[in-house]
Amino acid sequence: MLDPRARTLLKTLIERYIADGQPVGSRTLSRYSGLELSPATIRNVMSDLEELGLVSSPHTSAGRVPTPRGYRLFVDTMLTVEAPIDAEAVARQVQNTLQAGEPQQRVVAAAASVLSNLSQFAGVVLTPRRSHVFKQIEFMRLSDKRILLIIVTPEGDVQNRMLATPRDYTPSQLTEASNYINAHFAGLSFDEVRRRLRDEIDQLRGDMTTLMHAAVTASTEVPDTEDTVLISGERNLLEVADLSSDMARLRKLFDVFDQKTGLLQLLDVSSHAQGVQIFIGGESTLVPIEEMSVVTAPYEVNGKIVGTLGVIGPTRMAYNRVIPIVDITARLLSLALSQQ
């Protein structure tokens, strides 16, 4: 547990390092901390913080820089997140970009772009998972013994299946079947629909039962699409010296973007948490590069979490600015998708 003096000096050191990108010495700490301490006293406190693993000394400088552990303590206990000065402008830009009524994939891709533009780092979005339940279905006659099954999920995703039936159906019969399913089974998984149809088979006409079973079978035979990660603004990170100054580190960074497996795992983990999460490289095993951090937040459709979005940038990022950008974007993306 740090005493107030050590906490103030650590907070000041991290804030100055984020702002300037240079190791912070005792003279700078004396100027910005607001504490009336001698350089010798400050050096003693810095030595204690170094022993605790919160700061380190680069070989080329007399100053110190925060470690991943120091950043974690900072964001967990010292960071004051306030609405940015341009909060209304940020919200307006997000709203203008995320137009309700647009196709879901386009809205989600726009969210990645707006995160990148506002943060000047990389924006990332885990696209909504395909729902295992349905909101509405419709049968459409195409020709003799060929029917188009249209499935609408709670997320607004529309899926089509082609059904080959043993007999022909009239449009009125198809309407009757879809009305029955929508009235009795909407909001359930197709596996649950299959189970209930077995229980109610005696109450239904044989032709309707055949059609419903064909619909359920077609819906469950098609495997779920894999989760997709959309990334925007990777090139912004080329301008970040912390990440681009070392070629091996830069190669590793773009391997993360190319393979996406690690990002998928990280975004999936954060989708099970409430609110904004901060993953710090070197401190989180989910972030493969020590100089990289990821700020994430889940987004919803009609109150149900369906994906995650975030910003990928250097560990030396202005967290107090990036956090509200991610939070605002997640909230407004949820609103746009829920209004579809």
Curated annotation (Swiss-Prot):
GO biological process, one term: negative regulation of DNA-templated transcription
Any one GO molecular-function label of the UniProt entry: DNA binding
Keyword Repressor: yes
Pfam families membership: HrcA, HrcA_DNA-bdg
Keywords: Repressor, Stress response, Transcription, Transcription regulation
Top-level taxon of the source organism: Bacteria
Function of the protein: Negative regulator of class I heat shock genes (grpE-dnaK-dnaJ and groELS operons). Prevents heat-shock induction of these operons.
Family, similarity comment: Belongs to the HrcA family.
NCBIfam families: hrcA
Database matches in PANTHER family: HEAT-INDUCIBLE TRANSCRIPTION REPRESSOR HRCA
Protein name as annotated: Heat-inducible transcription repressor HrcA
